[in-house]
């Protein structure tokens, strides 16, 4: 899963990607976070657009929070384990360490996640009016194989863009995610 500001950090076309979390995210992504045994959060500040969807006490019990800024660790959600460091370096070290262990079969969970994702895609009733998701789907079809950066202002179009365009590389979606500054895009 990803936050709005983290879209593209993990390819949206990857089968293991479930969606964007938070109030503007996909139901399936929020459910995956609620149901997970362990959440490794990398570089997120857990703003109110994210945390409003979760029981903070339950989330805190299964949270490993990685951030380069020590002040962000446990700032919003108490963290079971806090790791201060560069995300790439921490992930490389974590992967090296985890390779020494064997894990249970995750195919059941993976199938559940795929089912959640499929249920999230609701067929839309076709009308003579073109809806925002259809416009964004057409835009995505035109840009998906190109090196394109998308920038938005704040508002409903920002949410639609985050939900309906797929970002497969980092830094391809530029938007104001903090104070919601008008005139950003």
Predicted regions and their residues:
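Predominant activation on well-ordered alpha-helical scaffold segments within soluble catalytic domains
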Residues: 1-2, 30, 88-95, 133-140, ...
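Conserved catalytic cysteine-centered active-site region
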Residues: 1-14, 166, 184
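General beta-strand structural signal in soluble alpha/beta enzymes
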Residues: 1-3, 41-42, 85, 150-154, ...
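Glycine-rich, acidic loop regions that bind phosphate or pyrophosphate groups
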Residues: 6-110
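Active-site diphosphate/adenylate-binding microenvironment
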Residues: 112-185
